[in-house]
């Protein structure tokens, strides 16, 4: 089996990148004979972290179809984006022809290049969406209307993965429901050592959540799960 993954950034700081790293690590552990490839904008610590698990990579600069709030988006800008999208999708197609993957996975909602290239070559494609841009990214505007972007994601995907039940319910309204599944534990947590499993149950626990917060990330689902555990 050959799989190719597309990342929108080259650093390893964000949750989407951590999900991708853990996915590559897990796949290589379970299926050491599989060949895994990456496409990303350029060198960085994401490639350094993923290198032990991949068999090849390609650098390719791709423009997002989400831009800053202060940028005007007219017909001229849309046509310019379409030209660049076509140019770099064709470049990506050449790379796919060379590695001949069985499946492609886009690890972001911000551009469709891999999905389009897979469609052109008849390769199955999965979209792993970590964001709800029309709800949680209020500082960005889409080059095209969100309904067009969501329709494109739906048409260009065999499967759509999201990171929370909230995101699953949201995208089921705008995409084919049967294609969408949520992954509620996407990032590996380090094993806790030195815990006394025989300790008495406490009546109150304090949980500290650190990081970026929005409905898509599943923090509420975490708290609900902890509450259910405490009631056992």
Segments and roles (model prediction):
Residues 1-2, 193-206, 230-232:
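Nucleotide-sugar donor-binding and catalytic loop/hinge architecture
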Residues 7-14, 26, 30-79, 167-170:
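N-terminal strand-loop element at the rim of the active site
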Residues 85, 89, 103-123:
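An aromatic- and histidine-rich active-site surface loop
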Residues 104, 154-165:
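A short beta-strand/loop micro-motif in the catalytic core of glycosyltransferases
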């Amino acid at each position: 089996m050959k799989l190719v993954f597309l990342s929108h950034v080259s650093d390893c700081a964000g949750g989407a990148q951590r999900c991708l790293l853990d996915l590559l690590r897990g796949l290589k552990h379970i299926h050491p004979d599989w060949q895994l490839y990456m496409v990303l904008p350029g060198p960085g610590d994401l490639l350094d972290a993923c290198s032990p698990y991949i068999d090849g990579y390609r650098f390719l600069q791709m423009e997002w179809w989400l831009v800053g709030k202060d940028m005007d988006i007219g017909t001229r800008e849309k046509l310019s984006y379409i030209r660049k999208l076509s140019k770099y999708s064709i470049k990506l197609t050449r790379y796919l022809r060379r590695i001949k993957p069985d499946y492609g996975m886009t690890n972001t909602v911000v551009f469709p290049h891999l999905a389009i290239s897979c469609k052109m070559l008849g390769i199955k494609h999965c979209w792993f969406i970590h964001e709800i841009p029309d709800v949680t990214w209020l500082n960005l505007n889409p080059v095209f209307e969100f309904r067009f972007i969501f329709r494109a994601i739906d048409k260009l995907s065999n499967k759509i993965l999201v990171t929370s039940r909230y995101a699953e319910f949201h995208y089921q309204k705008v995409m084919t429901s049967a294609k969408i599944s949520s992954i509620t534990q996407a990032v590996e947590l380090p094993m806790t050592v030195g815990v006394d499993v025989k300790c008495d149950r406490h009546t109150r626990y304090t949980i500290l959540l650190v990081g970026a917060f929005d409905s898509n990330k599943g923090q509420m689902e975490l708290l609900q799960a902890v509450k259910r555990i405490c009631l056992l």
